[in-house]
Amino acid sequence: MKELIEHIVFQLTAMHTQIEILTDLQDSSFKGKDDYWRICIENIIENAARYVHHEIKIILKDQYLEIFNDGEPIDNSNPESLFQPYEIGHKGQFGLGLSIVYKTVTMYGYKVEAVNRVDGVSFIIQRKISRMI
C-alpha cells in the first residue's frame, strides 16, 4: 500500500502544484486488489484537493489510512449520506467518488468514516474489528 500511495501522490503533486501533500507512510498491506485501492485513494485525495486550503496529509499505518485536508468541515446533519451515490457537496461533481470508496472499502472488510477536525477533515479507512461472542 505504501508504494501505491507514493505513486498516487507523485502523480497528483504534478497536477496540484499549489497544494502541499505531506505523507507519513509505514509499510502496510491492505486486503484486496491494488487497482481497486488505487481508485479508492485517488477519489479521496481528489475530493480533498477540491476542498483543501493549503495542505493534504496522508498517514498510513498497519491496517489504517488517514487522508486529511485543511478545508472546511463536513456537514454532520446526515453523515451516512456522504457515501451515497449522487450525493453532491457544495464543490462536488457527480456524487459518485465517495460511494465508490465506500463500496471498495466495505467489500474488503474495512470501514470508512469522515471525521471533522479542529483544522479540517479526515477520511479514515481501517480494518473492521470483529468481536467474538
For the regions a protein language model found, what residue spans apply to each?
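Short beta-to-alpha transition helix within the HATPase_c
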Residues: 1-14
